[in-house]
From Swiss-Prot:
Pfam families: Ribosomal_S19 (PF00203). It is found in: Cytoplasm. It comes from the Eukaryota. This is Small ribosomal subunit protein uS19z. GO terms for molecular function: RNA binding; structural constituent of ribosome.
Length: 152
């Protein structure tokens, strides 16, 4: 039994780290990038299919043009320039992967780097519009807060 353990550890050291290849609904990333929009839309959930069937209007197309330009202007191996937008309802498409988008949350622009896992989601899902409540801390607005502040 002692002889088996060194073989297992040696095999584990020799084995290289392999990363899971990304796929969206069973289609790999390269195929998604080459896929026509009509075929791509069929992979999306019904709400997004309905939205895409109505077509992209001027504002979303302008955002996609700016993203393309930012990617072309970026030097090789560098991240593209941030493109700011108020279009929180824009659906993330495979073409947008690798771009950096500043999504407005009502106060500031939150920078989001688009990753393959974000395909089919809205930009708004990654830019929260409120500050989450932190309960139980004494201070402004808490009832009887002076009771819980330690004396120095």
């Amino acid at each position: 039994m002692a002889e088996v353990e060194p073989d297992v550890s040696a095999a584990a050291l020799a084995k290289k780290r392999t990363f899971k290849k990304f796929s969206f609904k069973g289609v790999d990333l390269d195929a998604l990038l080459d896929m026509p929009t009509d075929d791509l839309v069929e992979l999306f959930p019904s709400r997004i299919r309905r939205r895409m069937s109505r077509g992209l209007t001027r504002k979303p197309m302008a955002l996609i043009k700016k993203l393309r330009k930012a990617k072309l202007d970026a030097p090789a191996g560098e991240k593209p320039e941030v493109v700011r937008t108020h279009l929180r309802n824009m659906v993330i498409m495979p073409e947008m992967i690798g771009s950096i988008i500043g999504v407005y949350n009502g106060k500031t622009f939150n920078q989001i780097e688009i990753k393959p896992e974000m395909i089919g989601h809205y930009l708004a899902e990654f830019s929260i519009t409120y500050k989450p409540v932190r309960h139980g801390k004494p201070g402004h607005g808490a009832t009887h807060s002076s009771r819980f502040i330690p004396l120095k």
